[in-house]
A protein has these predicted regions:
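A structural boundary/capping signal
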Residues: 1-170
């Protein structure tokens, strides 16, 4: 069933792909690899795991509208990270390269979403200063965010605009 597809994609990709930074793999600070590139190299960073899981689940018949790449801040590890979110009728599930167990987004409160995209749709997440009310848009540039588990969040910068990131996973 559906849960089996999610578990299979998460466990297979986590077991098949070795974590390696973009600098080590591609000689670049940040590179969003296609699923084929990640498989060919047998390695990738967190967003490469998420892209490969997304591609695998699409091939298994999971609707694209249910699959979302989420770039977030992991407040417990003080870094930026990327995961695959899966929207279900029972809430949002997170497929993560740091754990084989699939978790509900509510089970990972240290993950603060920054931006996400699914197909041709994209979102910027956040709250207004001094408020817990989510905002719809942001004036904050996303050009300084690059998910990578091995680099502390304050030192990150991204080398691709969101439109190019979306194009690389389609």
């Amino acid at each position: 069933g559906f849960a089996g597809k999610l578990a299979t994609a998460n466990i297979v990709v986590n077991g098949l792909i070795k974590y390696r930074s973009d600098q080590e793999t591609y000689g670049r600070f940040d590179y969003w690899a296609t699923a084929a590139e990640t498989i060919a190299r047998g390695a990738g960073d967190c967003e490469d795991f998420a892209i490969l899981k997304q591609t695998m689940l699409r091939a298994m018949g999971v609707p694209d509208k249910s699959l979302t790449i989420i770039v977030l801040r992991d407040n417990s590890r003080d870094l930026y990270h990327a995961v695959l979110g899966v929207s279900t009728n029972q809430g949002n599930l997170i497929l993560d390269n740091v754990r084989d167990q699939i978790a509900s987004d509510t089970q990972i409160p240290q993950y603060q979403p920054l931006f996400s995209f699914s197909g041709s749709r994209s979102w910027i997440h956040g709250t207004r200063k001094g408020s817990s009310t989510p905002i719809e848009t942001s004036q904050q540039p996303t050009a300084k965010i690059a998910p990578d588990e091995s680099i502390p969040a304050p030192a990150l910068s991204i080398s691709l605009p969101l439109s190019e990131l979306r194009a690389s996973i389609q």
